[in-house]
Amino acid sequence: MLSRKATAVLLAVHAAAMLASQTEAFVPIFTYGEVRRMQEKERYKGQKKSLSVQQRSEEVGPVDPTEPWEEKQEVIKLTAPVEIGMRMNSRQLEKYQATLEGLLREVLPPSRNAQ
């Protein structure tokens, strides 16, 4: 049989888990300092990348503005099926229902039954 302390701890953990599943709040995983360091690293990478692009463009020479400029289009090919999903409780569904319906109308083609 479990001791009273163990039972109290398990009950507290269960209550915290139940409350966490019901809230919509954001729980930070990283501290403010860690986020700031990550942002600085990203900024540094961006500056480094823009410098290398600028150096390459200088090596190629000035671009003639009368020439047509082709934009590089990248296509991402998936090698495995991808499924994106989200879980909502009834309160969240009521709150975001109109927005979700609008997004689905934009993404999905009109069905023949709706006409």
Curated annotation (Swiss-Prot):
This is Promotilin. The gene is MLN. Residues 1-25 form the signal peptide. It comes from the Eukaryota. Keywords: Cleavage on pair of basic residues, Hormone, Secreted, Signal. It holds the Pfam family Motilin_assoc. It is found in: Secreted. Its main location: secreted. Belongs to the motilin family. InterPro entries: Motilin_assoc, Motilin_ghrelin, Promotilin. The keyword Signal applies. It comes from Bos taurus. The keyword Oxidoreductase does not apply. One of its GO terms (cellular component) is extracellular region. GO terms for molecular function: hormone activity; motilin receptor binding. Plays an important role in the regulation of interdigestive gastrointestinal motility and indirectly causes rhythmic contraction of duodenal and colonic smooth muscle. Disulfide bonds: none annotated. Residues 43-72 are annotated as: Disordered.
